[in-house]
Amino acid sequence: MKEIKAILRPNRLSVLRERLMLLPNFPGMTVSKAEGCSARSVLQGSARPKDDLADYVPKVRIEIVAPDDTADEIMDVIIKVGQTGQVGDGLVWMTDIGRAAFLYKTTSLGAGRSDMLNKPSAKDMPL
């Protein structure tokens, strides 16, 4: 399993969603509002602290947990859609996940964890 995270320009989100939904095994995504600044704006700096608080640019943060066999394809779509060639386009990265599970069912997403299916459900466990 892989976790793919991306910080993108908000105006790229609708196109990205359309393209990702075309992938046959797209697992879904979580989207959050974010703010950020590029390294260039940090290095240029500001003489007034008030300016430092106002120079953040609106972004969206996307998080996707995907099987190993689809993660590279998802990341490629994010790169193609998000890249405009301008400073501030954003960032995308991928990390390994040892184990994940859907909360609405007892299906484990992590490799080697099929034993989850034989364990008692959460409703059978005391709180």
Where are the predicted features?
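Positively charged, small/polar-rich N-terminal and surface patches that mediate targeting and assembly
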Residues: 1-127
